[in-house]
Swiss-Prot record:
Pathway: Amino-acid biosynthesis; L-proline biosynthesis; L-glutamate 5-semialdehyde from L-glutamate: step 1/2. HAMAP family: ProB (MF_00456). This is Glutamate 5-kinase. Keywords: Amino-acid biosynthesis, ATP-binding, Cytoplasm, Kinase, Nucleotide-binding, Proline biosynthesis, Transferase. One of its GO terms (biological process) is L-proline biosynthetic process. It is found in: Cytoplasm. Its EC number is 2.7.2.11. It comes from Microcystis aeruginosa (strain NIES-843 / IAM M-2473). It comes from the Bacteria.
Length: 379
């Protein structure tokens, strides 16, 4: 069966961690694997890091820059050189490619989100492999994807992928960094319920030239599996592992997918929008929205965190801070704070008007099923 496959390769796998020099042998092996997947009829997307590292090498810069403007300029230098290498290698195998540069605000706008989906579908029909990266040159720091692990998971959700492979500098997920703790236990398979509860010392940062550590890969796994995408982590310098995992071999760490929602708009609410704040709920509200499919009312809200406006996205959390759902609010954070814990009929008297009886209508509310099930079934 033909499948849609997203592969993300990190800077640590593409380059030497000390010098930033590209590992052409790894890139060539990756290109060969992706071309084989495409020749077999699969739809293939590559999310490639490395632009900043390659740019630093090209300009003789020894350390990854910290200033945003400098990093964006260096990314512009590196992205062109990186794409030239990919194009040369894919062309030698007769495989056409396309470059897609995304920013978070584009995916937050529903029309742009749909346009991006349509572009990917058109490329698939043309037999093209899309190579994706964040458009660092114009990205706003506060609205960046943050790392390509997150970007790859969001792309996988957007295009309704079957698989997301994250290629990194370790062979699988461990209970701690195996480079620092040799006794760290390997983790072969993670269910949605286990992922919701997973708490390990995964490290907070990546290599010198990259931005993503194992913690970002777990965050990506939560996004991808919640969107119905199977995800695997495996060693980046062995791209052939992708084919072996798809053939059923027990390599790397595999994260089991949840059932995918058929509602494309709700997938956009869950993963396309960037939450601007948090709303904490009492037990009754949690049961009503998670088990009863109800809208969120003011009465069930105990706390509001962050500043946001009406029509923006927020996270819905239990009292311990675990995220249960996401939704688009009908009121601002200030207004919700004023009406929290009150019955809906009091909204007009408290605010002087009533924009809606609900804080979040159920049509604009998405349950993140594994976490909500875990929370509501607790104790």
């Amino acid at each position: 069966m033909n499948q849609t496959i997203v592969i993300k390769i990190g800077t640590s796998s593409l380059t030497d961690n000390e010098t930033g020099q590209l590992s052409l042998s790894t890139i060539a092996a990756l290109v060969e694997v992706l071309t084989r997947l495409r020749a077999a009829g699969h739809r293939v997307v590559l999310v490639s890091s490395g632009a900043v590292g390659v740019g630093c090498r090209r300009l003789g810069i020894q350390e990854r820059p910290k200033k945003i403007a400098l990093k964006q300029a260096i990314a512009a230098v590196g992205q062109g050189r990186l794409m030239r290498i990919y194009d040369d290698l894919f062309t030698s195998l007769g495989q056409p490619i396309a470059q897609i540069l995304l920013t978070r605000p584009e995916l937050m706008e529903r029309t742009c989100y749909v346009n991006a989906y349509n572009t990917f579908q058109a490329l698939f029909e043309l037999g093209v492999i899309a190579i994706v990266n964040e458009n660092d040159t114009v990205a706003i720091d506060e609205l960046k994807f943050g790392d390509n692990d997150t970007l790859s998971a969001l792309v996988a959700s957007l295009i309704e992928a079957d698989w997301l492979f994250i290629l990194t500098d370790v062979d699988r997920l461990y209970s701690a960094d195996p480079r620092l703790f040799p006794e760290a236990a390997a983790i072969a398979r993670v269910s949605p319920a286990e992922l919701a509860q997973l708490s390990i010392d995964a490290g907070s940062s990546g290599s010198q030239w990259g931005t993503g550590g194992m913690a970002t890969k777990l965050a990506a796994a939560r996004i991808a599996t919640s969107a119905g995408v199977e995800m695997a982590i495996t060693r980046g310098r062995q791209p052939g592992n992708i084919l072996k995992i798809m053939a059923g071999e027990a390599i790397g760490t595999r994260f089991e997918a949840q059932k995918r929602s058929d509602n494309a708009r709700k997938r956009w609410i869950a993963y396309g929008l960037l939450p601007m704040g948090k709303i904490y709920l009492d037990a009754g509200a949690i049961q009503a929205i998670c088990q009863g499919g109800k809208s969120l009312l003011a009465a069930g809200i105990t706390k509001v965190e962050g500043e946001f406006s009406a029509s923006e996205s927020v996270q819905l959390c239990d009292q311990e801070g675990r995220e249960l759902a996401r939704g688009i609010v009908n009121y601002s954070s200030e207004e919700i704070d004023r009406v929290k814990g009150q019955h809906s009929e009091r909204i007009a008297s408290l605010l002087g008007y009533m924009a809606a009886e609900t804080i979040i209508h159920r049509d604009n509310l998405v349950i993140l099923s594994a976490s909500s099930t875990t929370s509501t079934n607790k104790g």
